[in-house]
From Swiss-Prot:
One of its GO terms (molecular function) is glutamate-5-semialdehyde dehydrogenase activity. It comes from Chelativorans sp. (strain BNC1). Its EC number is 1.2.1.41. It catalyses: L-glutamate 5-semialdehyde + phosphate + NADP(+) = L-glutamyl 5-phosphate + NADPH + H(+). Catalyzes the NADPH-dependent reduction of L-glutamate 5-phosphate into L-glutamate 5-semialdehyde and phosphate. The product spontaneously undergoes cyclization to form 1-pyrroline-5-carboxylate. Belongs to the gamma-glutamyl phosphate reductase family. Disulfide bonds: none annotated. PANTHER family: DELTA-1-PYRROLINE-5-CARBOXYLATE SYNTHASE (PTHR11063:SF8), GLUTAMATE SEMIALDEHYDE DEHYDROGENASE (PTHR11063). This is Gamma-glutamyl phosphate reductase. It is found in: Cytoplasm. Pathway: Amino-acid biosynthesis; L-proline biosynthesis; L-glutamate 5-semialdehyde from L-glutamate: step 2/2. It holds the Pfam family Aldedh. It is an enzyme of class 1 (oxidoreductase). One of its GO terms (cellular component) is cytoplasm.
Length: 428
């Protein structure tokens, strides 16, 4: 019987180094590829995805069966699952990226110096991007398409949970590159699930990776942030808050709380903590919690919350620091917008926060004083998404302050350089 040998550590080092070299080689022609050629590749990818829907769903069925047998949580299985509607949405997302303006070559600013020099700041690709993700096969397409549009090569390392689905999707992306005459190595997929492959990416593949973007749970993101020797665009977790001010309209507060928590509980933009102004606890708190409970949400709160809503479970200090990714919400009464800001400043992961209010002073204070990547007024936290921002799609959400913050779309996947035009000037 043929024995299948797991790759050795030496094999993985060699494999990953080769992926890095090929990615760098592909990045050079990609950086100067025309918008028309990149868009042709994207449209061909979308067509290939739709034409191969049956093959993609068969691969996804294999992943789902393995995931169920392994006891994966409902939230992870939801992220992993594909159906015809989701595959169609992935294809439409790629078409939307093709419709976006090409950021490469855009003159961000220009000015003239007294000595006659004309200076331009121009957008350029980052180079080679590494994307490390878990049970999200759609990231294969989103990341590949976004990086291509921004003129970057990308190396994709999906989790073992989504290996078959990601491989099927990746083959469609390569088909699109081939049809458009672009290097097939512009979008590479790590073909092994050994974790040492991640380690090699974090070490930078011999200087051939320029940025790493992790998409996954806390343990993955922590490892990337702690070990990476190249810049990282990431958020550790999404502890998102919804604050209901004393000036909030009740019907709006109920609708936004319900959507922010329950539309999809497993996404990073789902609200995990509800803060309610104590001044409207008598009118707003119970209707909001009744709506959440009726939708199947578990309520956790302090004694003042439980006194008004006895079915609530007692909240601990740990609840304020927890990203549930489930139908659970922690609830706290606060003394106005100042205490809401203080609570968020203490417990937030700096991802997304929202205020429901009609008072412009409270709104401005909330938006100005909270240091999170995304702040919303009278809108659900679940709008924390690059597609909803008009970016076509996103490669992730970044909560850091260097280079990229918030949804990471095509513009955030570029850097810039200076072009200086002279007429023979020499420096005195």
């Amino acid at each position: 019987m043929l024995q299948v040998r797991e790759p050795s550590e030496h094999d993985i080092v060699t494999l990953m180094a080769e992926l890095g070299r090929r990615g760098r080689a592909a990045a050079r022609p990609l950086a100067v590829a025309s918008t028309e050629r990149k868009n042709a590749a994207l449209l061909a990818m979308a067509e290939a995805l739709e034409a191969n829907t049956g093959r993609i769903l068969a691969a996804n069925k294999t992943d789902m069966e393995k995931g169920e047998a392994a006891g994966l949580s409902a939230a992870i299985l939801d992220r992993l699952k594909l159906d015809e509607k989701r595959v169609r949405a992935i294809a439409e997302g790629i078409r939307a990226i093709a419709d976006l303006d090409d950021p490469v070559g855009t003159v961000i600013a220009e000015w003239d110096r007294p000595n006659g020099l004309h200076i331009e700041r121009v957008r350029t690709p980052l180079g080679v991007i590494g994307v490390i993700y878990e049970s999200r096969p759609n990231v294969t397409a989103d990341a590949g398409a976004l990086c291509l549009k921004a003129g970057n090569a990308v190396i994709l390392r999906g989790g073992s949970d989504s290996a078959a689905s990601s491989a099927a999707i990746h083959s469609c992306l390569v088909e699109g590159l081939r049809k458009a005459g672009l290097p097939e190595d512009a979008i590479q997929r790590v073909p092994v699930t050994d974790r040492e492959a991640v380690g090699e990416m974090l070490r930078g593949l011999g200087g051939n990776l320029d940025v790493i973007v992790p998409r996954g749970g806390r343990s993955l993101v922590e490892r990337v942030q702690n070990e990476a020797r190249v810049p990282v665009f990431a958020h550790l977790e999404g502890i998102c808050h919804l604050y209901v001010d004393r000036s909030a309209k009740l019907d709006m507060a109920v609708a936004l709380a319900l959507n922010a928590k329950m539309r999809r509980t497993g996404v990073c933009g789902a609200a995990e903590t509800l803060l309610v102004d104590r001044a409207v606890a008598g009118t707003h708190l119970v209707p909001i919690l009744e709506a959440l409970a009726a939708a199947g949400c578990e309520i956790r709160g302090g004694e003042d919350v439980r006194a008004r809503f006895p079915s609530a479970i007692s909240a601990s200090e740990e609840d304020w620091r927890t990203e549930y990714l489930d139908a659970i919400i922690s609830v706290k009464l606060v003394d106005g917008v100042f205490e809401a800001i203080e609570h968020i400043g203490t417990y937030s992961s700096h991802h997304t926060e929202a205020i429901v209010a009609e008072d412009p002073v409270a709104v401005q204070r909330f938006l100005n004083e909270i240091d999170s990547a995304i702040l919303l007024h009278n809108a659900s936290t679940q709008f924390a998404d690059g597609g909803e921002f008009g970016m076509g799609a996103e490669i992730g959400i970044a909560t850091g302050k260097m280079h990229a913050r918030g949804p990471v779309g095509v513009e955030q996947l570029t850097s810039f350089k200076y072009r200086v035009h002279g007429s023979g000037q020499t420096r005195p």
